[in-house]
From Swiss-Prot:
EC code: 2.1.1.-
Protein name, as recorded: Putative S-adenosyl-L-methionine-dependent methyltransferase MMAR_0358
Listed GO MF terms: methyltransferase activity
Protein task: Exhibits S-adenosyl-L-methionine-dependent methyltransferase activity.
Biological processes annotated in GO: methylation
Cited InterPro entries: Ppm1/Ppm2/Tcmp, SAM-dependent_MTases_sf, SAM_mthyl_Trfase_ML2640-like
Length: 311
């Protein structure tokens, strides 16, 4: 279903369902023989009865059949699992480095089913703020509580839409602008229109003390990437029609939920222009460094992981 400026969701619908897909990949990676990451909370979060339909929809999206005549475009579940494992490992390391440098205030934007507050070894005095829609945060809190899980850090939920005045909601939850902060925007940018992306970066900058850090998953925004995305959308439309004719479930497709409006900022350029020291790592290179073969130079492995520090 196309996005609208004021749409909303719970964990089983729209953008919320993409968090389930990501957690399914983390659960699969954790259960593998040589996992890059260990997320013992992913499987409990995605195995509830209320998510049965979403699990089936994601499985159908990941499925490959002999009739799929565009194998370069067909979603490969192992490719996605590998990519999301590499991504999770990178941003886990980012937080570990941040707290080692003395940062004790953490903000996870669009937290979804992120379990880092529960599974990372946070030093005493660390506070983790999770921002997402109320129904998404409620689902995670109640599900983990039923499994007896308790956060390692002080966890504060901030139930607010990132398209609204989330900085005020964050401050109301106890966030202190005078303290250095480690921010994370993982898997977020495509789900925000360009204006909201600019506003997000502006708010991060305005609420960051000296010594703060930010990490952002960067999706292609240049003209070549935009044209490639349009071509992929056309190819997927043809493939979707064939799958529908075979009776396959095509109701889940994260790309349907992305905004593709003009003017989306490059986070590395944006933060550099605002005085931050930036670095950027291509996901494919990071995968190779970790011993995971990037399946292709297409798809998610062309994404970049951007980090920046405020002097």
């Amino acid at each position: 279903m196309p996005r609208t400026a004021d749409d909303s969701w719970d964990i089983a619908t729209s953008v919320g369902a993409t968090a389930v897909m990501v957690a399914l990949a983390r659960a699969a990676e954790t259960a593998s023989e040589t996992p890059l990451i260990r997320d013992q909370f992913a499987e409990p979060l995605v195995s509830t009865p209320e998510l049965a339909a979403v699990r089936e929809q994601v499985a159908a999206w990941w499925a490959q059949t002999d009739d799929d005549d565009d194998p370069d475009f067909t979603v490969d579940s192992q490719q996605m699992t590998d990519y999301l494992a590499v991504r999770t490992h990178f941003f886990d390391s980012y937080f570990i480095d941040a707290v080692a440098a003395g940062i004790r205030q953490v903000v996870i934007l669009a937290a979804g089913l992120d379990s880092r507050a529960y599974r990372l070894d946070w030093p005493g005095g660390t506070t983790v703020y999770e921002i997402d829609l109320p129904k998404v945060l409620d689902y995670k809190e109640h599900t983990l509580a039923r499994h007896g899980a308790a956060p390692v850090a002080a966890l504060r939920a901030v139930p607010v839409d990132l398209r609204h005045d989330w900085p005020q909601a964050l401050r109301d939850a106890g966030f202190q602008t005078s303290l250095p902060t480690a921010w994370l925007a993982e898997g977020l940018l495509p789900f925000l229109p360009a204006a909201a992306q600019h506003a997000l970066f502006t708010a991060i900058d305005a609420n960051s003390a000296t010594g703060s850090r930010v990490a952002v998953e960067m999706f292609g925004v240049d003209e070549d990437a935009r044209r490639a995305a349009e071509e992929r959308a056309q190819r997927w439309a043809r493939q979707r029609a064939k799958r529908q004719a075979r009776g396959q479930d095509t109701s889940f497709d994260p790309f349907d939920l992305w905004f593709d409006d003009e003017g989306q900022p490059d986070p590395a350029d944006w933060f550099a222009a605002h005085g931050w020291t930036t670095d950027s790592v291509q996901a494919g290179a990071e995968a190779l460094r970790l011993g995971r073969t990037a399946h292709s130079q297409e798809g998610p492995f062309v994404n970049r992981f951007v980090t920046a520090g405020k002097p």
